[in-house]
Amino acid sequence: ISASVWVESETGQTWWGKDSIVTISYTKKSYYYNYKYEPYTQNRYFIDTRDLDINGKYRLCVSIPGIGEYVTPFREVMIAQEIDSLSYRLGPDNSVMNLMLSSSGNEGQSKYYRWNYREDWENNPPIMPQVTYNYKDNSIGTLSYEVKDSLQKCMAFSHSYDILVYNTNQLSENRLENYLFLSFPTMDRRMVGLYCLTLYQTPLDREGYDFYKAMSVNDNLGGLYAPYPNEIMGNVLCTTNSNKVALGYVNVCTRSMKRIFIDGGKLNLIDR
């Protein structure tokens, strides 16, 4: 479905989105295989908002031919709370890796937080191949040192999937100290070598927090009495048909970022 997506200011300025068409062409001639990926469209749209005036008000607009027009309310730009630090702590018997954050908001900043992150780590294979098979002439060859070295130095990555939100309403200060946001076993492949986590923090208003909190409860529990997705109302409205329900919540804000590196190899947690 081809759609038009743009950000609109309260004064009428527009910033148009670009749909993502990813082209990957990859050919490996060292071995016997030949990979080629054709261009594809993911129906994702990117809007460069870096030059927007933070003192303005903005909304998201979507137009889908034959389906409808969708808009969000105009919102002021919320400034993200700074991430003061990222740290880690090993659990009992060094069996669990716990990642924690500390953050402090200034006077007037939101007390509602949302996070997402990206993980990158060295993914060295536990068993290295020594030979290769060429199906064209039915021959077996030996992998060179250069090839084995390139296979041994691999990287893997992952993104957060869980909805991570929190608020400081019950605290005396708008501050988080060593808040635990991620845990995983130290036996995990992520701890074999160098590990990097990049954390992104964005502020939410109360309505946005309630939306994501309801979504997280529905995602974690499910069950007979869990709310249906269309019962969790966001702030995306269809202006051409009020009976249509759009899922999602759009916030207007900046975001802060912090990165931590952990050398799992130097920790020597388990003899691998």
PLM-predicted stretches and their roles:
Residues 1-272:
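A sequence/structural signal for flexible, mid-protein segments enriched
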